[in-house]
């Protein structure tokens, strides 16, 4: 079974942004009023209902309609003027707001920077080590102020500490009981605050 391929070459994406203006017979930077006026004139001339015998009239009408749709939309027109039909294709794929980012990242200097950083970091291996492992197997880890041995407390020392704390508590019995509180009791006394329990 043979494939139905048209004899026409598929249109290449332009980056100049002039072919839609040429379809309407205008210069780049034409005003919206000029675009509308020219569109009406060409649409009437190439409308398929007015040219039923001409099969190319329908294709020409579609091209004119497409050019008018793009050039009357300010966002699409700005993208087309700056990046051409390739910019419109990128806008369809990634959204209008990401067109500038796409072309910036696909520029020669961004690709070069990406390659240089990749080479300097060993295919980005050092970047992973900096984020995950404090770089170079921990050699760049921040130093702690006290050695780790001081954090170890033997069980005997811990028991001795508990005994001495209990003996101190027995020497000083609780003398004051908490007072009853209600809604009118002030939680913070006016005057100087004292955190000492000795009276």
Curated annotation (Swiss-Prot):
For whether the record's keyword set contains Glycosyltransferase, the answer is no
Where is this gene product found?
Answer: Membrane
User: Which InterPro entries does this one have?
Assistant: DnaJ_C_subfamily_member5, DnaJ_domain, J_dom_sf
How would you describe this protein's topology in the membrane?
Lipid-anchor
The PTM entry states: Palmitoylated.
Domain J intervals? 19-84
> Disulphide bridges in this chain?
none
| UniProt keyword list | Chaperone, Lipoprotein, Membrane, Palmitate, Phosphoprotein
Q: What is its main location?
A: membrane
Q: Which Pfam families match?
A: DnaJ
Keyword Isomerase: yes or no? no
Recorded hits in PANTHER family, A to Z, give: DNAJ HOMOLOG SUBFAMILY C MEMBER 5 HOMOLOG, DNAJ HOMOLOG SUBFAMILY C MEMBER 5B
Query: What is annotated about its quaternary structure and interactions?
Result: Interacts with the chaperone complex consisting of HSC70 and SGTA.
What name does UniProt use for this protein? DnaJ homolog subfamily C member 5B
- What taxonomic ancestry is recorded? Eukaryota, Metazoa, Chordata, Craniata, Vertebrata
